[in-house]
Amino acid sequence: MAYASRFLSRSKQLQGGLVILQQQHAIPVRAFAKEAARPTFKGDEMLKGVFFDIKNKFQAAVDILRKEKITLDPEDPAAVKQYANVMKTIRQKADMFSESQRIKHDIDTETQDIPDARAYLLKLQEIRTRRGLTDELGAEAMMFEALEKVEKDIKKPLLRSDKKGMDLLVAEFEKGNKKLGIRKEDLPKYEENLELSMAKAQLDELKSDAVEAMESQKKKEEFQDEEMPDVKSLDIRNFI
């Protein structure tokens, strides 16, 4: 089970839930005590409900990992896709965000009080960098160029409350998207590619952890005569 916990914690989609679960284990919830002398408060019941909700989600994730075969080979597209599908199933069972949903949530919550377009784009840049996303198409540069053009035309900084100015900016974005070959109907494909990219990175980290663990084991005297197995042959289900 220790390996399973470590394995699960490598998934960014699950990290938040697991951290909460660990925190709940550390909190002395008085509602769990068998003392009959004190009344149960609503706050205790709410905390108890949160605890069991997170615990059930964690168990659901472990149950899925007991059934699904995961190959630690980030260079194999089929293995990456399988891992991504397993993580998607876990997210759905545990009612957690996908990477694209998490990014959208970050954007919605962190930009709601930003008044001007430039600060908004800078915040998007910050979120992209923080999430480890690359801008291979150059869309970010295009958006700043579009903003420069609009602000030059209106001769003042563009506020998000300026409907006419924002319409001009959106029109410039659409021109830029067309040049870059970005289409709205392709958004589901971009989201899928993002999930696969994240899955590959996580699978690569899992592989590195497995190799490190085996090499550490190999240094122990009782294992020096044993041949280290190919990491791709490991079956995670055997460790859960």
Curated annotation (Swiss-Prot):
Compartments it resides in: Mitochondrion; Mitochondrion inner membrane
Keyword Protein biosynthesis among UniProt keywords: no
Transit peptide start-stop: 1-32
GO biological process: pollen development; proton transmembrane transport
Superkingdom of source: Eukaryota
Record's compositionally biased regions (Basic and acidic residues): 210-222, 229-240
PANTHER family: ATP SYNTHASE 24 KDA SUBUNIT, MITOCHONDRIAL-RELATED
Purpose of the protein: Mitochondrial membrane ATP synthase (F(1)F(0) ATP synthase or Complex V) produces ATP from ADP in the presence of a proton gradient across the membrane which is generated by electron transport complexes of the respiratory chain. F-type ATPases consist of two structural domains, F(1) - containing the extramembraneous catalytic core and F(0) - containing the membrane proton channel, linked together by a central stalk and a peripheral stalk. During catalysis, ATP synthesis in the catalytic domain of F(1) is coupled via a rotary mechanism of the central stalk subunits to proton translocation.
Protein name, entry field: Probable ATP synthase 24 kDa subunit, mitochondrial
Organism: Arabidopsis thaliana
